[in-house]
Amino acid sequence: IFTKIKNIEELNLAIANSSKPVMLDFWASWCVACKELEEITFKDEAVIAKLQGFTLLKADVTANNEDDKALQKLYGIVGPPGLIFWDKDKKEVTSSKIVGYKNPTDFLQIVNKNF
């Protein structure tokens, strides 16, 4: 289950309060690849099992307001979907950054390298 965050402050607070690694999903209602991630990748049993070990956050950037733009700029996300990861020590794991749709196999291959 994803917890929605609206800005950098909420993101930082969520990361600080997490005892697990964190995954942030940049999402928008008009984003076809975001829907594919939700309907295919995030419903895969192996992916579900893997993500149980994470705090899951979602930034809905549909409105593309100033907070949305600031979050995307901070993490180099031009547009959704984008997935950013932090380890349990609250350090960003840039080698696990995912931009665009990934099927369950490719998603797990990237995430399993570091987690």
PLM features: what roles do these ranges have?
Residues 1-55, 59-115:
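Proteins that catalyze or organize thiol-disulfide redox chemistry
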